[in-house]
Amino acid sequence: VGTDLSVGGHMTGGGLRGYFAFGEGGNFNSTQYLSGPDGATHTAAFGYDMPRAGSITAVSVCINASSVSDSSGPDFKHSHVVGKVQIDGTDKISATIAGAANGDTSYSAGKKDLRTTQSIGTDTFSAGENLMVQIVITNFTQAGTSSTTLTDVTVIVECTFDA
């Protein structure tokens, strides 16, 4: 084809996509922000500086729960592990990785993964805002205290940029 194509409006499935990696290779058992590939630990105020406006359109998570213990009796609750994708420290997408908010869902040590997608425009950001990922671990105390130790955490966030 010898001419340029011009579209007035949004093309479904169109847009430039970017993929941002976050992770932690060491062990941790409390809430923390994940690092970027350069090893710099992100915070609620420091993450990937987004080069242009767009939307968060997908998230993929893989973790290894290297150690899991419950709260002992009477209810034997397990820690709740949640991954949160944030823009400038504000939650955009939250997904349970293991357990339940009330501690009632049990799980074993081992690898766990999940992924989720959403439509363009659901969770948006502006150029210059910061993208970061936080892993939140909530423990429960009864006769003992539940705990989960994570290692080898990898999170990939897909963003679709506006034209």
Predicted regions mapped to residue ranges:
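Short, surface-exposed beta-strand/strand-loop-strand elements in extracellular ectodomains
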Residues: S72-T90
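Short beta-strands within extracellular/lumenal beta-sheet-rich domains
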Residues: L34-R52, T116
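Glycine-rich, low-complexity segments
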Residues: V1-T41, V82-K84, K92-G103, A109-K111, ...
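A short beta-strand element within beta-rich, extracytoplasmic domains
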Residues: G54-S72
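Short consensus segments that form the blades of beta-propeller domains
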Residues: S69-K77, T145-T148
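Noncatalytic modules at the cell exterior or secretory-pathway interfaces
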Residues: G121-T141
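Extracellular carbohydrate recognition
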Residues: T141-I156
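Exposed aromatic-hydrophobic patches
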Residues: Y107-T122
